Regions:
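Active-site-proximal flexible loops/turns
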Residues: 9, 66, 244-246
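Short hydrophobic/aromatic segments of transmembrane alpha-helices and their interfaces
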Residues: 45-46, 52-53, 278
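Outer-membrane beta-barrel translocator/receptor signature
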Residues: 37, 49-58, 64-143, 215-218
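Alpha-helical transmembrane segments and their juxtamembrane interfaces
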Residues: 12-13, 69, 431
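N-terminal targeting signals for Sec/Tat export/insertion, comprising classic cleavable signal peptides
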Residues: 30-48
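Bacterial Sec-dependent N-terminal signal peptides
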Residues: 1-25, 512
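Outer-membrane beta-barrel porins/channels
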Residues: 20-34, 108-512
Length: 512
């Protein structure tokens, strides 16, 4: 059935396979707190406790509690078990892989003389903030929309003629046009008046989405903190975020009817996508002890300013039966065998942390502390993420308008929200028992998208003769939404994701 889909000019959509998707804003913003095994065992709490190298990435004032040198290494292993429901059809996907928590070293010492600053500490550490090793796979029957409609929107919005449709969108629309998955729509006099999709949406298709991702969001932190009379601790860290993200995507739509003459059998879209970034940022914080057993903390994380380079290769195979038969087109054929590349900048959301801890039998000698309970409240302004053109493209009016619209979309579909973390520890001479939990609220403004992350964790620790080892298991229960594609002319359909992710973390440390 031939039909022209019109695009609202004011709408923002994924304009090509190389364009940024608003979902990418969450990749470096919505994550559960990672750290050493000790920190993960207590739910990621480290806003006011200090004395752990993970503080360099949460509240750098916490490294001011160090009085000695320390070296820490934290290897880990992750388990992912995802469940999806897409338009009434359930599916599952599993993926496991290695990861790591906060690792590095701290150099600390007391200050001699009459200085008000009792001691100071310097730390260099690396932390895997997010692990991207995952698999997202779902399927279902859809008689509401099609992946191909994003190509119609793109060609219609740009008022593309047939020459442009053949060559200007080499990672998406041009592939669909060359395989006759999308074709021209002609008036009775033969003139081209638009474009049509050969996918019979009204009778429906069986859709499959299968994405395998790998990589991680890493952060190097160089921190310094000072200790004033064992009452006030202030610190800051200079951060270098590094992103390595890889995705292998397979997507298909298959005719749900048995009609061999409706000019559509199936199509398959394949994509290889990589995204690498490096940036700078800062974290500032303070911890105050109004009494020996109480610690209050506050930290502010500036936005991370990151420079991205994305690369992509894609292909489409389509069978339109007696319309054009079986056809294939690849981006390599249209781009001299090279991947597509785009450079741009991203500013991540800022965040604030307020924290309080109660330490039982608090003394200046941390070896004599017997227990603690601590809580963090974190606010993240997810809608503050921003995309920008870079280099020679800064003055490109088309890209400038595109990023302006994309940023408006980010502001519309996301919101700020609060994350709550709670944890505690009991110490029995050289052995410790720990437990914690956390709740991460939804970043989506649309209440219909049910998204959250709940963390339950526990662990054991051993400390003796300048050596310590910690073992933790952290269990994350996820709720999220996954969009196979986004459209501008109708409500988007998505898969509801539930499931769990488990992490086993071991931290080995030495007091030097």
């Amino acid at each position: 059935m031939k039909k022209l889909f019109l695009l609202s000019i004011s709408a923002i959509v994924t304009i090509s396979a190389l364009a940024q998707n608003p979902d990418e804003a969450l990749r470096t913003a919505w994550f559960t707190q990672q750290g050493t095994a000790r920190v993960m065992a207590i739910g990621g709490v480290m806003g006011s406790l200090g004395g752990d190298i993970s503080a360099n990435h949460i509240n750098p004032a916490g490294i001011g509690l160090y009085k000695n040198k320390e070296f820490v290494l934290s290897p880990g292993f992750l388990f992912n078990n995802n469940k999806f429901n897409y338009r009434g059809t359930d599916s599952t996907a599993k993926n496991n892989g290695f990861g790591y928590g906060t690792s590095g070293f701290v150099i600390a010492g007391t200050n001699k003389g009459e200085s008000k600053w009792t001691s100071s500490a310097f730390a260099v550490s690396v932390n895997q903030i997010a692990n991207y090793n995952n698999r997202v796979q779902f399927r279902g029957f859809n008689n509401y929309s099609s992946f191909t409609e994003q190509y119609l929107e793109e060609l219609t919005r740009d008022r593309a003629d047939t020459n442009a449709a053949l060559s200007n969108y080499i990672f998406g629309s041009s592939l669909a046009f060359r395989t006759f998955l999308v074709d021209t729509l002609a008036a009775p006099n033969g003139s081209v008046i638009g474009y049509q999709s050969l996918v019979p949406i009204s009778t429906g298709t069986y859709q499959i989405y299968d994405a395998r991702t790998s990589g991680g969001y890493h952060e190097i932190a160089l921190g310094f903190a000072g200790n004033m009379a064992d009452r006030l601790y202030v610190g800051g860290s200079f951060t270098i975020p590094i992103v390595k993200y890889n995705r292998e995507l397979y997507y298909s739509e298959k005719d749900a009817t048995t009609n061999p003459a409706n000019e559509f059998s199936f199509f398959e879209y394949r994509e290889t996508f990589t995204s690498n970034a490096i940036g700078i940022g800062a974290k500032l914080g303070a911890i105050y002890k109004p009494a020996e057993y109480i610690r209050l903390g506050f930290a502010f994380h500036t936005p991370q300013f990151m420079a991205y380079v994305d690369k992509i290769r894609s292909s489409i195979i389509a069978n339109t039966e007696n319309y054009a038969g079986l056809r294939k087109a690849t981006s390599d054929e249209l781009n001299s065998g090279n991947p597509g590349e785009r450079k741009y900048n991203v500013t991540t959301p800022w965040r604030m942390i307020a924290s309080a801890s109660y330490v039982f039998r608090e003394t200046k000698d941390i070896r004599r502390q017997r227990a603690f309970i601590s809580a963090d409240i974190e606010y993240v302004n997810y809608r503050a993420a921003r995309f920008q053109a870079t280099g020679d493209n800064v003055n490109n009016s088309t890209l400038r308008d595109y990023y302006s619209n994309l940023n408006s979309t980010v502001k519309d579909i996301y919101k700020g929200n609060i994350n709550v973390k709670l944890g505690g520890e009991l110490k029995f001479k050289t052995f410790m028992v720990r437990a914690g939990g956390a709740y991460y609220g939804s970043p989506y403004a649309d209440a219909a998208i049910k998204a959250s992350r709940t963390v339950l964790s526990g662990g054991l620790g051993y400390r003796n003769r300048g050596m310590f080892i910690d073992l933790t298991y952290s269990h994350v229960m996820n709720k999220d939404a996954v969009f196979a594609y986004r459209l501008a002319d109708k409500a988007n359909t998505f898969a509801n994701q539930t499931g769990s992710a488990g992490t086993v973390m071991v931290t080995l440390g030495f007091k030097l």
